[in-house]
Amino acid sequence: MKKVLLTLAALGSLSATQAQQAGSWLIQGGMTRIAPSVSSGTLSAPSPSGTTVDVGADNQVTAQVTYVVDQNWALAVPLGLGFKHKLYGTGSIAGVGQIGTVSALPLSVFAQYRFGESNAKFRPYAMLGLSYAYFHDAQGSATLNSLNPLNPVGGSTGLKVDSKFALSPGLGMAYQLDDRWFVDFSYAKSLLKTTTTLSTGQSINTTLNPAIITLGIGMRY
């Protein structure tokens, strides 16, 4: 009986170690919050002088697939259906409220360096990602229509937000619950700038630099 117990214990230890070897896949699901930290330029003329903008945060259900390259290195690809952000007037038009919306689909790949032994229960990591922020379905609100001096009577002001590449450095931590299940938390900052152009010709440059905060639970394969 004692030999059987020792054998089972050894197998359990072996499976925990093998599960984190090169070639393992980590599949997780959870929530991601994208919160822009906006530094806005001013809207070009003709427009109210000093017109600037802010961009609201959004939370969505997301997933992530990670491939373990070796004991320390891994490649992670976040997955999701995208985010929808509200646009607000600031500066000389502060207080007017929402002036539009834009949908964003971030396409990213992250290289992670995981500290500690491969079979450790707690592993912090540093990461660097390349992200492509695909902006689509940007729409101006009735408030923007009324503020735009070039908007035709009864018409609407369209928006186009340029899609851009950005580097995304970050930190994270993973905690192994058992041989297969784990909890993962990460924080990244995407160094993102873009330009928004109105259908009537005015444009505005913005530094978005969104924080990307993800909490997930997953399984190791």
Regions found by a protein language model. Give the residues of each.
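Cleavable N-terminal export/targeting peptides
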Residues: 1-23
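Short loop/turn motifs that connect adjacent beta-strands in outer-membrane beta-barrel proteins
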Residues: 19-24, 72, 116-123, 177-180
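Short glycine/proline- and aromatic-enriched beta-strand/turn motifs that initiate or cap beta-hairpins
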Residues: 19-66, 218-220
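Residues that define the transmembrane beta-barrel architecture of outer-membrane proteins
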Residues: 23, 57-61, 101-107, 122, ...
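Gram-negative (and chloroplast) outer-membrane scaffold detector with strong preference
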Residues: 35-37, 64-144, 210-221
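Flexible, solvent-exposed loop segments that connect beta-strands
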Residues: 39-53, 83-102, 134-163, 192-206
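Short, conserved structural micro-motifs that define repeat-unit consensus positions
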Residues: 66, 170-176
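Predominantly the C-terminal beta-signal and adjacent terminal strand-loop region
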Residues: 84-88, 178-221
